[in-house]
């Protein structure tokens, strides 16, 4: 029952997205976003588990975008997935988060499982239409796996388990006690209806209300040996999962900023008069408001250029699989940390300052402009951006990377 720790010989991801691939999935994501936009505010206020939204993602094909074509998926690239996340965030940051976490939970197959075992996992996720949640929050006490015949028993609890409320399966990390894997952290997959696994519907926060990020409790949950993906190690290619997830964050912060700008523009153009001290005929013709929007738009465009570049770079490095070096991994992780910094600050600033051009009337509860700020403000606290700044500064000054963790 020992878990192999050999380097991954390959990943199923190769090359970069074609123009055709990007065009197709942009159209799919845009259609989904338009559907989400219709009642985003109403759904946010209800604060219910997003089962209908999960089904929308499933029926659109977005859940299987990254599954290799040889196993029944779309055979897409991370660059395309990042863009889909960004487009959805224009309309609904919660569902963009749900999709982002799904992608990196699902592709844990490639990051953790031995190559010869990956095909069966990919085929199962397609056949059953799985949405993948997670239960790996590292700031909670460690989950414990206790050895028993042909498997384990899992005990403990995790908060902030994104997607667990609506996912068919969740990926879990836990520390093994006893046996030949004693002291190892294993990644494994559990169905959310497993006996002893309790989904606690306690996600009631300022924003990202529909990300299904509730708590999960485990009471002597059976974990079969066949449900183990592999060991969580510091092998360079397997540890690229976390920078990839951080880049997904940058994309949905960017998408929220773009959504706030679009909604702000709509509201500003709808204002028919002007401030009484202005000589402009309308608010939208007032250079003060034009200047503010110009500044916010330019900053958002700069973030977009950076994350698009990094999406392509991520695909290229993932394709090297076991040949990825620690130095290459560190360089890309720091570049993604830079994107995390500017996307966080730009997203929060845009979602906040958009009110400067839309006026008091835009704070009405039925307008819902606050949804963008509440969403980006909530998730941008996931890990302190100041530590990302330190990570970048340390690498720039000394060429020293931060220790590998579930945040770096």
Place the predicted regions along the sequence by residue.
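Glycine-rich phosphate/cofactor-binding loops in nucleotide/flavin-utilizing enzymes
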Residues: 358-408
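Glycine-rich beta->alpha junctions and the first turn(s) of the following alpha-helix
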Residues: 205-301
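Glycine-rich phosphate/pyrophosphate-binding beta-alpha loops
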Residues: 159-164, 245-249, 382
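Charged, amphipathic alpha-helical oligomerization/scaffolding segments
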Residues: 28-31, 256, 263, 295, ...
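Intrinsic disorder at enzyme termini
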Residues: 1-21, 389-408
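Glycine-rich flavin
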Residues: 49-59, 64-166
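DPxDG-like acidic metal-binding loop motif
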Residues: 157-194, 359
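C-terminal helix-coil-helix/basic helical segment that borders enzyme active sites and/or dimer interfaces
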Residues: 41-44, 301-341, 355-358
């Amino acid at each position: 029952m020992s878990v192999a720790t050999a380097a991954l010989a390959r990943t199923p991801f190769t090359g970069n997205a074609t123009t055709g691939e990007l065009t197709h999935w942009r159209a799919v994501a845009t259609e989904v976003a338009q559907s989400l936009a219709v009642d985003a505010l109403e759904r946010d206020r209800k604060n219910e588990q997003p089962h209908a939204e999960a089904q929308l993602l499933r029926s659109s094909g977005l859940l299987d975008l990254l599954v290799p074509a040889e196993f029944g998926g779309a055979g897409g690239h991370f660059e395309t997935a990042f863009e889909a996340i960004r487009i959805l965030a224009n309309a609904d940051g919660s569902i963009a988060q749900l999709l982002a976490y799904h992608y990196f939970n699902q592709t844990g197959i490639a990051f953790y499982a031995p190559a010869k075992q990956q095909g069966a996992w990919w085929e199962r996720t397609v056949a059953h239409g799985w949405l993948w949640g997670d239960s790996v929050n590292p700031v909670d006490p460690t989950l414990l796996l206790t050895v028993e015949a042909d498997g384990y028993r899992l005990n403990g609890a995790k908060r902030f388990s994104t997607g667990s409320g609506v996912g068919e399966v969740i990926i879990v990390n836990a520390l093994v006690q006893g046996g030949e894997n004693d002291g190892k952290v294993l990644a494994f997959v559990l169905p959310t209806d497993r006996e002893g696994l309790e989904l606690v519907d306690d996600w009631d926060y300022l924003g990202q209300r529909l990300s299904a990020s509730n708590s999960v409790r485990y009471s002597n949950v059976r974990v079969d040996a066949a449900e183990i993906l592999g060991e969580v190690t510091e092998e360079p290619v397997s540890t690229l999962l976390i920078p990839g997830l951080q880049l997904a964050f940058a994309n949905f912060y960017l998408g929220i900023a773009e959504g706030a700008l679009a909604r702000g523009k709509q509201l500003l153009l709808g204002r028919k008069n002007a401030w009484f001290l202005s000589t402009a005929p309308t608010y939208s013709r007032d250079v003060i408001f034009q200047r503010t929007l110009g500044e916010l738009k330019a900053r958002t465009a700069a973030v977009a250029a950076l994350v698009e570049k990094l999406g392509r770079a991520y695909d290229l490095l993932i394709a090297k699989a076991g040949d990825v070096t620690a130095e290459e991994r560190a360089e890309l992780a720091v570049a993604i940390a830079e994107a995390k910094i500017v996307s966080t600050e730009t997203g929060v600033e845009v979602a906040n300052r958009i009110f400067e051009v839309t006026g008091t009337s835009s704070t009405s509860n039925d307008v819902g402009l606050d949804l963008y700020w509440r969403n980006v403000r909530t998730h941008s606290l996931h890990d302190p951006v100041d530590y990302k700044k330190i990570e970048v500064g340390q690498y720039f000054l000394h060429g020293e990377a931060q220790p590998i963790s579930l945040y770096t």
